[in-house]
Swiss-Prot record:
Keyword Nuclease: yes
Superkingdom assignment: Bacteria
Organism listed in the record: Gloeothece citriformis (strain PCC 7424)
Gene assigned in the entry: rnpA
NCBIfam families: rnpA (TIGR00188)
Enzyme kind, highest EC tier: hydrolase
Keywords attached to this entry: Endonuclease, Hydrolase, Nuclease, RNA-binding, tRNA processing
GO molecular function, one term: 3'-tRNA processing endoribonuclease activity
Enzyme Commission number: 3.1.26.5
Its job: RNaseP catalyzes the removal of the 5'-leader sequence from pre-tRNA to produce the mature 5'-terminus. It can also cleave other RNA substrates such as 4.5S RNA. The protein component plays an auxiliary but essential role in vivo by binding to the 5'-leader sequence and broadening the substrate specificity of the ribozyme.
UniProt name for this protein: Ribonuclease P protein component
One BP annotation, GO: tRNA 5'-leader removal
Gene3D superfamilies: 3.30.230.10
Pfam family membership, one: Ribonuclease_P
Gene Ontology terms: cellular component: ribonuclease P complex
């Protein structure tokens, strides 16, 4: 089971916008880039939070390993989705050296970064940054 369609960040221009305008939070194995975007007229109907995952060849030359890491990250996102507030665009970048990392470690680091970025347990924003 993959990440629901409405929670996927796919287009190149969306990734670029998050990289240029968003904030950056780091941990030993992950980097997240975040950008808050919401409908200006009604914050109750804001867009769901979208996630993009980037695993470069610096992490591993083998696509099988990169895809396994992406599956682990998607599973961690699915587990955290009920706690995540709406209106965010998040790009998760996997750092080199994460090949040996287990699911529990990814989940713990991702949750800590999302809390730090106020995407989990953060206040609901009613304005556009």
């Amino acid at each position: 089971m993959g990440l629901p369609q409405e929670h996927r960040l796919k287009r190149r221009k969306d990734f670029q916008k998050v990289y240029k305008q968003g904030g950056r939070y780091t941990s030993p194995h992950l980097i997240i880039r975040t950008l808050f975007e919401s409908c200006s007229e009604n914050s109750l109907n804001s867009q769901p939070t979208c996630f993009g995952i980037s695993v470069s060849q610096k992490v591993s030359k083998k696509a099988v390993i990169r895809n396994r890491i992406k599956r682990l990250i998607r599973q961690a996102i699915r587990e955290l989705l009920p706690q995540i507030s709406n209106g965010w665009k998040v790009v998760i970048v996997i750092r080199p050296g994460s090949v040996e990392c287990k699911y529990d470690r990814f989940l713990r680091e991702l949750k800590q970064l999302l809390i730090k970025a106020e995407i989990i347990n953060g206040h609901q924003r009613e304005y556009i940054l």
